From Swiss-Prot:
Belongs to the PLAC1 family. This is Oocyte-secreted protein 1. It comes from the Eukaryota. Keywords: Secreted, Signal. Residues 157-183 are annotated as: Disordered. Expressed in oocytes in primary through antral-stage follicles. Expressed in liver and ovary. The keyword Phosphoprotein does not apply. The keyword Transport does not apply. May be involved in cell differentiation. It is found in: Secreted. GO terms for cellular component: extracellular region.
Length: 202
């Protein structure tokens, strides 16, 4: 009986490792030259297939490009979409979140994202700001051009719920700001709180 239980545990462990590998290859995050570049698969959340108009970066920034191979892309300036910027001497820490809001059900999922940029010429030892500037900061030049065939979806401002959990699925109806229900966690390895970290040079 014990060998059977041990074999079953090994199979469950291998299945868990495969699920982790599948989901972690479903995300690519880069930040450089004051650009935040994120690519995801619509299956990044366990047992959920997201449509491009159901997933948002930060405070409601929609997918900027949908690729034929089922890849969603977000390309935004690091001071937009409510992305938090924390400058510490020679590095800048960017923090935001990815939010899924179902159109057909009261289902919501969130994932925290972080990215570290190394500053070539640091001017501040500690400063913190949150995005939503209306124009380029002084001295910042636009060095990235949008593709000609890229179609930018109009900005959508969904009602996002706040939570201390880094990653969870909520059954809260997002159409109402006052009605709140208790969050139900994702039944997978992604139950654990985590942040996606990426280190990049400017």
């Amino acid at each position: 009986m014990k060998p059977f239980v041990g074999l079953l545990g090994l199979l469950l462990l291998l299945s868990f490792m495969k699920t982790c590998a599948d989901d972690w290859t479903a995300i690519s995050l880069q930040c450089a030259d004051h650009w935040f570049h994120l690519r995801i698969r619509p299956t990044i959340f366990h047992n959920i297939f997201m449509e491009p108009d159901e997933v948002f970066l930060g405070i409601g920034c929609p997918v900027t490009t949908t690729w034929p191979n089922d890849t969603y892309e977000f390309i935004y300036r690091t001071y937009s979409c409510g992305i938090a910027n924390k400058v510490l001497c020679d590095v800048t820490l960017l923090k935001t979140q990815l939010t899924y809001i179902s159109k057909n059900a009261s289902l919501q999922a969130e994932m925290s994202l972080s990215c570290v940029m190394h500053n070539q010429s640091p001017h501040f030892c500690e400063a913190e700001s949150r995005g939503d500037f209306t124009g380029d900061p002084p001295g910042w030049t636009e060095d990235m051009r949008a593709r000609r065939d890229e179609q930018t979806v109009p900005m959508v401002q969904p009602n996002l719920s706040t939570s201390s959990e880094d990653h969870h699925v909520s059954t809260e109806p997002w159409a109402s700001e006052t009605s709140r229900s208790e969050a139900a966690e994702v039944p997978s390895f992604m139950d654990q709180n985590f942040s996606v970290f990426h280190f990049s040079r400017m």
